[in-house]
Amino acid sequence: MSSSLKQLKEQFVSDLTGGTIEEIYAVTSIALSSYLSFRLLKKSLGDLALIYDYILNVLTILASITVYSNSPSYLHYFIVIPSLVIYLVNYHVEKPSSPHRQNDTKEDKSDELLPRKQFITAYRSQMLIITNLAILAVDFPIFPRRFAKVETWGTSMMDLGVGSFVFSMGLANSRQLIKNHTDNYKFSWKSYLKTIKQNFIKSVPILVLGAIRFVSVKQLDYQEHETEYGIHWNFFFTLGFLPIVLGILDPVLNLVPRFIIGIGISIAYEVALNKTGLLKFILSSENRLESLITMNKEGIFSFIGYLCIFIIGQSFGSFVLTGYKTKNNLITISKIRISKKQHKKESSSFFSVATTQGLYLACIFYHLAFSLFISNLSFLQPISRRLANFPYVMWVVSYNATFLLCYDLIEKFIPGNLTSTVLDSINNNGLFIFLVSNLLTGFINMSINTLETSNKMAVIILIGYSLTWTLLALYLDKRKIYIKL
C-alpha cells in the first residue's frame, strides 16, 4: 500500500466525534426486528430456506449500516410488517385448538441447569454479525462517519460494538464458571496456581494472533490508528490478557459478587483518571515515544475498562444462562435450585430470580447508574471508548442488559423451537469467524482503494464478504467442526 493512500485511509477514520445514543439504538435494534421477523415467519411457514435465513439475519443488518443508515425506521417497518401480516393470517387460518399451537404456547420450563437458550444464540450471533460487517464497512464512504470509532470523547456504533463484544464473551464464559462452581470455596495455593497456569495456556493462541496481526500490519504497511490502542497493542491483546488477569483475581472473584468487583474497579479507575495525572498522561501526544508503556497507553489502560465489562458480563450468566432459579443468582453463582415453596420462605428471595425477572432488574439498575452519570456530567468525564472509562462501561452494560431482555421477550412472545441455522452456525465458531472476517478485511483493503469505491460497488463487496464467512460458518457447523480459540 502506498504511503499516501495509507495516510488517506488513516485520516478517513481519525478525529471523528460520533453520533447520538438514540440513533445508535435505532440502527442496532434492526437486529431485534430481524430476529422477531425470522421467528414470526418460521412459526407461520415452517423451516425457511437458507437464503431467507441469510437475508433476514445478515443482509438486513448490512442494510441498516449502509443503505438505510439515515432512515432505520423504514427498514424496521419493511422487516416486521410483512412477517407480522403472514403470522396473523396464519394464526386465524390455523385452528387455535390444534395440538401444535397448544404445545407452543406452554412456557418452556427446563430441568437443566444450563440449557441452550435460543435468544442467547441470537444475541451473540447478531452482535458478531454487526461487528464483522462494521470492521470492513467503515473503510467505505457508504458507511456514515458518525458510526465509526470516535477519537476520544463521544458515542458511536463501533464504540458500542467493541464493548458489547467483550460483554458477550464474559456472558458466554460464565457457563464454564457455573459448571465448575462449588458453594464452599476454600482458597489453596495449589488450585490458585493451577488456575493461573490454565488461564495462561488458554490465552496463548489469542496473544499469538495479536502478535501476528502486529507484525503483518507493520510488514504490509497497513493503515493503523495509533490513538485507538497504541503502536503495538491491538484488540487481540486485550482479549488475550483477560484470562490471565482473571486467573490472578480468581480468589476475590470467588468471594465477592462479580458485579461489585466490576463496578468497583471501574469506579476506582475513574477516580484515578480524574484525581491524578492519569487522564492527561493517556491523552498527551507528546509522550508517545518515551517508553513501551507510553507507546501502548491506550491499549494498556482501556484494558481496565474492558476487564470490568467482561466481569460484569460474567455476573449476568448466573441468571441469564440458567434454566431455573438458583439461590441468590441475581448477585452470585449458585447451583442450589429454589422451588416455589422455598422462594416464598427465603428471606433473600428477591435475589433468586428467573431469567426475565433478572434482566428487568439489571436493566433498571444499570440504566439508573448510567442516568446518574448523564445528570452529573460536570463531575465525570464524557463517555470515552479510548479510555474505557466508567461512563463507557455503564453505557455498554446497560445497552446489553436491555437488548438481552428484548431478545428474551421476543422468544417468549413467539415461543417454540424456532432456531436459525445461520445464527447457530456463526455462534458455534464465533471467535474463529471474527478472525476470518479480520483477515478478509485486510485482504480487501490491500486489494482495492476503498475510499474511491462507489456505494453500489461497496454494497456488492460487503455482500460477497458477508456471504463468505457465513458459508464458512455453515460448512464448519455441518461438518461439526468447532474451532475454539
From Swiss-Prot:
Belongs to the PIGW family. GO terms for biological process: GPI anchor biosynthetic process. This is GPI-anchored wall transfer protein 1. It is found in: Endoplasmic reticulum membrane. Keywords: Acyltransferase, Endoplasmic reticulum, Glycoprotein, GPI-anchor biosynthesis, Membrane, Transferase, Transmembrane, Transmembrane helix. It is a multi-pass membrane protein. InterPro entries: PIGW/GWT1.
